[in-house]
Amino acid sequence: MPYLKRVLLLLVTGLFMSLFAVTATASAQTGGSFFDPFNGYNSGFWQKADGYSNGNMFNCTWRANNVSMTSLGEMRLALTSPAYNKFDCGENRSVQTYGYGLYEVRMKPAKNTGIVSSFFTYTGPTDGTPWDEIDIEFLGKDTTKVQFNYYTNGAGNHEKIVDLGFDAANAYHTYAFDWQPNSIKWYVDGQLKHTATNQIPTTPGKIMMNLWNGTGVDEWLGSYNGVNPLYAHYDWVRYTKK
């Protein structure tokens, strides 16, 4: 083989191997399949938000004490009030990030005007990444409905509200989304309810659950009336990597 061709072959091979290594490393950094029945809190797997507020429409401070495990074998997020017109809320998130796959949760949201109970994936500028997010949200003003949404590099406005045919706050049900490169499919108790195919998120995110009260978004959530304590219940979470 002529010298020049041999050099070019080595350069191309090296570039391919470098790209392969980067891809493999990125893949290795995302979490694998798991099932957590919430029989106890795994602090090596999950993190509790504590001591700060998201601000803007979030009218509460995240407190680790507002994330607890109950004797019923469930995780409970609480919305409480330590003082007049001051509110604490609960948020739980995974340590690792997760990519394409099936995300499932068995949960009961809190019921009250002005609040949100959720299950979602998120990554953003504080993580050094674009804002990518996929949501399952319950607006406490009407828990006979569920809202699906997603953000890709900060672009949202993909809300879809689905009538459940039951009150989600009264009993446990399973909610899920299947995130793939060209689509997101949302499910309720195994039944497909909504599909999105445009501008699908690409960045792995942390698995998150939270309960919070809003401010300045009454048209969306309704006005929060100060009722507390309120609780959202999570029986289990499962992720199946695909």
Swiss-Prot record:
Question: Hey, what's the signal peptide range on this chain?
Answer: 1-28
Q: What is the designated name of this protein?
A: Beta-glucanase
Q: List the Gene3D superfamilies.
A: 2.60.120.200
Q: Which family does it belong to?
A: Belongs to the glycosyl hydrolase 16 family.
Pfam families registered for this protein in UniProt: Glyco_hydro_16
The organism's place on the tree of life at top rank: Bacteria
The reply on keyword GTP-binding is no
Q: Where is the active site?
A: 133 (nucleophile), 137 (proton donor)
- Protein encoded by which gene: bglS
Gene Ontology, cellular component aspect: extracellular region
The misc remark on file is: Beta-glucanases of Bacillus have a substrate range similar to lichenase of germinating barley.
Mention one GO biological process in which this protein takes part, according to its record: carbohydrate metabolic process
Disulfide bond residue pairs: 60-89
Q: Which residues form the GH16 domain?
A: 29-242
Q: What is its main location?
A: secreted
